């Protein structure tokens, strides 16, 4: 059993709860997710099933889109409404100023990750350390805000949709907006609308569907992974399973072109056999000897 699932995580549950629900309904232990969503947040959560968990790192998820509603004049420990209130301030700022400040964050900027987050410090999750009273201040990281639109101001709230780079914390963005306004702000509602090509309009709630719906919703890894494909002969599949490095005589067809050092998918009869690193440019493979090694195996999959 292999494939990705485009799931909808409802409010009030953890990303791990979603994984557990999939494990229970599909009766499979090997399930993992890409990109944690906080319990108070909802929206798209990409899940890998079976050996697909080993492919989550190859997903093209550099861009994510969110809807967020923030509360003005409130600062919390966690940068969201679930945290303890640290400070409250009056906020009599004109709507136009709020809109201008929100828009000013489009582009690259250095962002400090929240102390309460799934980010790791010396192997430990920050939120676990914070709950133990160990507040870790991490250095700012470079993030990019690709665009902000649909800004609505209804004091004491304001909301907008935002497209961001991987690793951007929307809670931190709300805090930074509040800081620039001079009155503070905290995230009140958060919905992830998309992760790469995974869109909320296609997402399914694993708590509301059964096993059959989950199975029919599995997405073939080849439709999602942005890697070039190479078709290999069936006679050589067992060689790969035994750890033999692919040579030119393994290759049936170069489905896509690739460069040296690119990761490629080795497929046979429509099934993924392995992920391998190209040791030659596809343009020059014909110059190789039939038994000359052209790929180095990285991950092998035996579901074929």
Swiss-Prot record:
UniProt entry keywords in alphabetical sequence: Isomerase, tRNA processing
A Pfam family: TruB_C_2
InterPro entries: PsdUridine_synth_cat_dom_sf (IPR020103), PsdUridine_synth_N (IPR002501), PUA-like_sf (IPR015947), PUA_sf (IPR036974), tRNA_psdUridine_synth_TruB (IPR014780), TruB_C (IPR032819)
GO molecular function, one term: RNA binding
GO BP annotations, alphabetical order: mRNA pseudouridine synthesis; tRNA pseudouridine synthesis
Biological role: Responsible for synthesis of pseudouridine from uracil-55 in the psi GC loop of transfer RNAs.
Protein name: tRNA pseudouridine synthase B
């Amino acid at each position: 059993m292999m494939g990705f699932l485009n799931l909808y995580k409802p409010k009030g549950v953890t990303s791990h709860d979603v994984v557990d629900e999939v494990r229970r309904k599909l009766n499979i232990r090997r399930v993992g997710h890409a990109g944690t969503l906080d319990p108070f947040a909802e929206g798209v959560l990409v899940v890998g099933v079976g050996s697909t968990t080993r492919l989550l790192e190859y997903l093209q998820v550099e861009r994510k889109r969110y809807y967020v509603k923030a509360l003005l004049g409130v600062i919390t420990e966690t940068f969201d409404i679930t945290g303890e209130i640290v400070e409250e301030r009056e906020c009599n700022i004109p709507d136009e100023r709020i809109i201008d400040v929100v828009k000013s964050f489009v582009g690259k900027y250095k962002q400090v990750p929240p102390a309460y987050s799934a980010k790791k410090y010396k192997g430990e999750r920050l939120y676990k350390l914070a709950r133990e009273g160990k507040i870790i201040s991490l250095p700012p990281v470079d993030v990019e805000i690709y665009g902000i639109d649909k800004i609505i101001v209804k004091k004491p709230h304001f909301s907008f949709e935002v497209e961001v780079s991987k690793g951007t914390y929307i809670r931190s963005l709300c805090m930074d907006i509040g800081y620039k306004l001079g009155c503070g702000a905290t995230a009140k509602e958060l919905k992830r609308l998309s992760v790469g090509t995974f869109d909320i309009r296609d997402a399914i709630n694993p708590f509301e569907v059964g096993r059959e719906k989950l199975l029919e919703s599995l997405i073939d890894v080849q439709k999602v992974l942005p890697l070039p494909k190479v078709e290999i002969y069936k006679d050589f599949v067992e060689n790969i399973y035994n750890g033999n490095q692919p040579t030119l005589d393994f290759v049936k067809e170069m489905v896509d072109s690739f460069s040296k050092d690119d990761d490629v998918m080795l497929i046979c009869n429509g099934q993924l056999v392995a992920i391998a690193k190209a040791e030659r440019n596809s343009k020059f493979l014909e110059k190789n000897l039939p038994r000359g090694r052209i790929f180095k195996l990285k991950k092998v999959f035996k579901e074929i």
